[in-house]
Regions:
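M14 metallocarboxypeptidase catalytic domain recognition
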Residues: 1-104
């Protein structure tokens, strides 16, 4: 049970509540990205590679979209979410990718 009173927040953990996340915004997890990449309008139109790995061993994805075959007229580098609290940038970038792919 969570309570916000005055300028404080209090949460009482329930039985079996082993994994709980508090967030200042709408969380954007790896599951969100994987679900987005499986959308019919996205699947096959985005190339996914591993750019690097984090210190904890997680993949940092590199997404390429647009002119995948041949030389593109332009190259644009977009980046989002340098820190876990910057999840809104991931939603914005997802929307931008969807808009570009919708132009095809």
């Amino acid at each position: 049970r969570a309570v916000v009173q005055n300028r404080t927040f209090r949460h009482t953990f329930g039985a079996g509540e082993d994994d709980l996340r508090f967030s200042v915004g709408m969380p954007y997890t790896a599951e969100h990205l994987h679900a987005f990449l499986q959308l019919p309008t996205v699947r096959g139109a985005v190339r996914v590679e591993t750019l690097t790995r984090t210190a904890k061993g997680r993949d940092v994805e590199l997404l390429t979209f647009g002119q995948l075959a041949g030389a593109p007229r332009f190259r644009i580098f977009l980046t989002a979410r340098h820190h876990a609290c910057e999840m809104m940038a991931s939603y914005a970038l997802e929307g931008l990718i969807a808009a570009v792919l919708a132009e095809k």
